[in-house]
UniProtKB/Swiss-Prot annotation:
Biological role: Catalyzes the GTP-dependent ribosomal translocation step during translation elongation. During this step, the ribosome changes from the pre-translocational (PRE) to the post-translocational (POST) state as the newly formed A-site-bound peptidyl-tRNA and P-site-bound deacylated tRNA move to the P and E sites, respectively. Catalyzes the coordinated movement of the two tRNA molecules, the mRNA and conformational changes in the ribosome.
PANTHER family assigned to the protein according to its UniProt record, in alphabetical order: RIBOSOME-RELEASING FACTOR 2, MITOCHONDRIAL (PTHR43261:SF1), TRANSLATION ELONGATION FACTOR G-RELATED (PTHR43261)
Annotated localization: Cytoplasm
One Pfam family cited in the UniProt record for this chain: EFG_IV
The entry's keywords: Cytoplasm, Elongation factor, GTP-binding, Nucleotide-binding, Protein biosynthesis
Protein name: Elongation factor G 1
Domain tr-type G, chain residue ranges per copy: 8-282
GO MF entries: GTP binding; GTPase activity; translation elongation factor activity
InterPro entries to which the protein is assigned, alphabetical: EFG_II, EFG_III, EFG_III/V, EFG_IV, EFG_V, EFG_V-like, EFTu-like_2, G_TR_CS
Length: 691
C-alpha cells in the first residue's frame, strides 16, 4: 500500500496541563471543528469523547491518555489528551515520550500551577516543542497578560504571544492575530461565524506593542531577518510564520495563543497554529536506539527504513488487549511477524486499529510517524521496542517513577481469590507505576501507586471491569532503602552432600547509584573467572536481593553493583548456585555500606487567604516541611513547600479547619530523601515488631 497522507503533513501532538485548565474540553472542540464528532461533548455532563472510562465520566477528570486521529487543512493530527491530576503523571510521561509537539493549556485565572510545572519539566526531559493556549478567557478574573508573565517567569520559557484577546470575562469577543495583524470577532455562540476586521482602536496600541515583541523574537532566530529588521524594513506575515515555525521546533520560542474552549472561541486558530508551527515526524531528531552489539544507531522517520516502534501503553477493553505503539520508522503491517527486541521474543501482528475514542477503525498498516494499537500481543509491555526481526534495535524505554503509597488488599470471598490475581496482573500490565507484591511476613497482597486517588481508581476498576470485591487496608508510605558508602563484598555458596555439589562465588563492588537509577549492574569480568553463562544468573540473584533491604525490609534502590571477580567449579557450578551467590553478596555488602532509610517527599502548594498564612506555614513546619517559596496574588497567599508524605495523611481536613474551608492545596511526588535518624529508628522498630 502507498502512504495516503504524506509524512510532512502528519502532526503527533499532546494536550497537557494542570487539572481543570480545560484540556479535555479543548480536545472535544478540536474534534468538533475538525468534523470527527458532530455534537460537542462536555466533561461536566460526562459526555466527553476522550473520557471513555466510566470513572472519567463520573469524576470529570481524564485518567488515561486517550489517542485520537483527526484531519485539519489537509493534515492528519494525532492527538493524545492527557490527565492533569498528579496521581496519573505516568500517563503524561509516556505521552511525552512518543509525541512531536505539545499544546500546554493554562487557565486564564489560575495561571501556572504545580502540575503545569511538572508537565513542563516532562516536556523538557524529552525536548518536545510546545505552544501555550491560555484558556477560559471568558471567566471572571481572566488575565491573559498575567499568565503570559507567569509562563516566562515560573517556567523560564521564551514565551511570545502570537495572539492577544479582545476583551476578557463577559466582554471577551474576539482575538487579534499578531502575525497577520487582523482582528477576528466571534458573532455567534457556536464559534463558526467569525468576522475578520481591522484591529479595534481600544486594543490597537497593545497589539502594536506585542507585534513588536513577536517580530524581535523571530528576527533573533535568523540572520537575514535580523539584518532586515535592523534596517527598518517590515517583516512579512509569511517570513514571520516561517521563522516562528523553525524557532518553535528548535524549542527557542513558545508561541502563546488564547481563547475559550467552552465558549467555542479560538479553537480553529489553535488548529491552524498546530499545522503552522508544530513539527512533522521527520522534523524532530531521529529516534536513537541500541544495536545488539551495544553500538548506538538512529532510525529516521522514513517508511523505507527498518521498522522501529515503541509500546507506550497497554489497555484492556472489550476488544481484547490493546498495545498502543508509536511507529518511528518503517511499516508495521497486519499479519506480519515482528520482534520484541526488549524481551527477544517474536510476536504476530493479528489486527491493527486507530482510535476515535469509542470507535476502533481497523487498518492494514501503520507507517512511520503513525500512532495506533495492536490487538492481542501477549508478551509486550509498556516501554518495549517492537522492530523488524532482521534489523533488531532497542529504543530507550520510559522513565517510570517509584510508587509512593501502598495498601493491602484481600479478596472478600473465596470466589474472588483467582479473579483478584488476574485483575491485578492485568492492571499492572497496563500501568507501570502500579506495583503488586506479597508481604513475606503477613502473606498479604500489597498494591502500590502514585497517590490515594490512583489506588482508589484501580480498586474501583477491579470491581467494575473484573467483578472483584476486595477489602482495602489503610494507606502506607512506600519507604525505600539505599546505601551511602562504596565497599567490596563477596558471596560464596558451597554445598557438598554426596554426589554433585553446588558452587558459586562472586566478588562485587557495591556503591551508591544516581538518584532514580534503581538497581544498576555492570560486569568487569576478564579472563573467565566467572563463565559468561553464570553472569546473568548472578545479576538476577542480586536484583532479587534488592527487593528487601536489611533495615526494615523495604526495597533497595539507587545502588550500583559491579562484578569484578569470582570463581567456579567445572562440575559443581550451576546457574542456581551463582544466583544464590549474587544474592548473598548484596546482603553482605549492604550491611557494610552504611544503609539508610528513604521516604517520599511531596511538593505541596497551598493557596489560602492572606490572614491564614501564618497558621499554614506553622503547620507545614510541624510536619517536617521545608518552605521553598511564598507569593501573594489578589488577596490570596501561596506557599510552596516540600513535605514528607508520611506527614500529609489527613492534611486536607486539617487545612480546611485552619482556613475555615477557604484554602486549597495540591500535592505531587518530588523525590526520595533520607529519613531523619530519630524518625527512622521508630519506623525500623515498628517493622521488626518492637513497637
Amino acid at each position: 500500500m502507498v502512504r495516503t497522507m504524506p509524512i510532512e503533513r502528519v502532526r503527533n501532538i499532546g494536550i497537557a496541563a494542570h487539572i481543570d485548565a480545560g484540556k479535555t474540553t479543548t480536545t472535544e472542540r478540536i474534534l468538533f471543528y475538525s468534523g470527527i464528532v458532530h455534537k460537542m461533548g462536555e466533561v461536566h455532563y460526562g459526555t466527553a469523547v476522550t473520557d471513555w472510562m466510566a470513572q472519567e465520566r463520573e469524576r470529570g477528570i481524564t485518567i488515561t491518555a486517550a489517542a485520537i486521529s483527526t484531519k485539519w487543512l489537509d493534515h492528519q493530527i494525532n492527538i493524545i489528551d492527557t490527565p492533569g491530576h498528579v496521581d496519573f503523571t505516568i500517563e503524561v510521561e509516556r505521552s511525552m515520550r512518543v509525541l512531536d509537539g505539545i499544546i500546554a493549556v493554562f487557565c486564564s485565572v489560575g495561571g501556572v500551577q504545580s502540575q503545569s510545572e511538572t508537565v513542563w519539566r516532562q516536556a523538557d526531559r524529552y525536548q518536545v516543542p510546545r505552544m501555550a493556549f491560555i484558556n477560559k478567557m471568558d471567566r471572571t478574573g481572566a488575565n491573559f497578560f498575567k499568565v503570559y508573565e507567569q509562563i516566562r517567569d515560573r517556567l523560564r520559557a521564551n514565551a511570545v504571544p502570537i495572539q492577544i484577546p479582545i476583551g476578557s470575562e463577559n466582554e471577551f469577543t474576539g482575538i487579534v492575530d499578531l502575525v497577520a495583524m487582523k482582528a477576528l470577532i466571534y458573532n455567534d455562540d457556536q464559534g463558526t461565524d467569525i468576522q475578520e476586521t481591522e484591529i479595534p482602536a481600544d486594543v490597537e496600541k497593545l497589539a502594536q506593542e506585542y507585534r513588536l515583541k513577536l517580530v524581535e523574537s523571530v528576527a533573533e532566530t535568523d540572520d537575514a531577518l535580523t539584518e532586515k529588521y535592523l534596517e527598518g524594513e517590515e517583516l512579512t506575515a509569511e517570513e514571520i510564520r516561517k521563522a516562528l515555525r523553525l524557532a518553535t521546533i528548535s524549542g527557542t520560542v513558545v508561541p502563546i495563543l488564547c481563547g475559550s474552549a467552552f465558549k467555542n472561541k479560538g479553537i480553529q486558530l489553535l488548529l491552524n497554529a498546530v499545522v503552522d508551527y508544530l513539527p512533522a515526524p521527520q522534523e524532530v531528531p531521529a529516534i536513537q536506539g541500541t544495536l545488539p552489539n551495544g553500538e548506538l544507531d538512529v532510525r529516521p522517520a522514513d517508511d523505507e527504513a527498518p521498522l522501529a516502534s515503541l509500546a507506550f501503553k497497554i489497555m484492556s477493553d472489550p476488544y481484547g488487549r490493546l498495545t498502543f505503539l508509536r511507529v518511528y520508522s518503517g511499516v508495521l503491517a497486519k499479519g506480519s511477524y515482528i520482534l520484541n527486541s526488549t524481551k527477544d521474543k517474536k510476536e504476530r501482528i493479528s489486527r491493527l486499529i486507530v482510535l476515535k475514542a469509542d470507535d476502533r477503525i481497523e487498518v492494514d498498516e501503520l507507517r512511520a510517524g503513525d500512532l495506533g494499537a495492536v490487538v492481542g500481543l501477549k508478551d509486550t509491555l509498556t516501554g518495549d521496542t517492537i522492530c523488524d526481526k532482521d534489523n533488531p534495535i532497542i529504543l530507550e524505554s520510559l522513565y517510570v517513577p517509584e510508587p509512593v503509597i501502598s495498601v493491602a488488599v484481600e479478596p472478600k470471598t473465596k470466589q474472588d481469590i483467582d479473579k483478584l490475581s488476574q485483575a491485578l496482573q492485568a492492571l499492572s500490565d497496563e500501568d507501570p507505576t502500579f506495583r503488586v507484591s506479597v508481604d513475606p511476613e503477613t502473606n498479604q497482597t500489597v498494591i502500590a501507586g502514585m497517590g490515594e486517588l490512583h489506588l482508589e481508581i484501580l480498586v474501583d476498576r477491579m470491581l467494575r471491569e473484573y467483578k472483584v470485591k476486595a477489602n482495602v487496608g489503610k494507606p502506607q508510605v512506600a519507604y525505600r532503602e539505599t546505601i551511602r558508602q562504596q565497599i567490596q563484598a563477596e558471596g560464596k555458596f558451597i554445598r557438598q552432600s554426596g554426589g554433585k555439589g553446588q558452587y558459586g562465588h562472586v566478588v562485587i563492588e557495591l556503591e551508591p547509584g544516581d538518584p532514580g537509577s534503581g538497581f544498576e549492574f555492570v560486569s568487569k569480568i576478564v579472563g573467565g573467572t566467572v563463565p559468561k553463562e553464570f553472569i546473568s544468573p548472578a545479576e538476577q540473584g542480586m536484583k532479587e536481593a534488592c527487593e528487601a533491604g536489611v533495615l526494615a525490609g523495604y526495597p533497595l534502590i539507587d545502588v550500583k553493583a559491579t562484578l569484578v571477580d569470582g570463581s567456579y567449579h567445572d562440575v559443581d557450578s550451576s546457574e542456581m548456585a551463582f544466583k544464590i551467590a549474587g544474592s548473598m553478596a548484596i546482603k553482605e555488602g549492604v550491611i557494610k555500606a552504611s544503609p539508610v532509610l528513604l521516604e517520599p517527599m511531596m511538593k505541596v502548594e497551598v493557596e489560602v487567604p492572606e490572614d491564614f498564612i501564618g497558621n499554614i506555614i506553622g503547620d507545614l513546619n510541624s510536619r517536617r516541611g521545608q518552605i521553598e517559596g511564598q507569593g501573594l496574588e489578589t488577596g490570596m497567599a501561596k506557599v510552596m513547600a516540600k513535605v514528607p508524605l508520611a506527614e500529609m495523611f489527613g492534611y486536607a481536613t486539617d487545612m480546611r479547619s485552619k482556613t475555615q474551608g477557604r484554602g486549597v492545596f495540591s500535592m505531587e511526588f518530588s523525590n526520595y530523601e533520607e529519613v531523619p535518624h530519630n524518625v527512622a529508628e521508630t519506623i525500623i522498630s515498628k517493622s521488626r515488631g518492637y513497637v
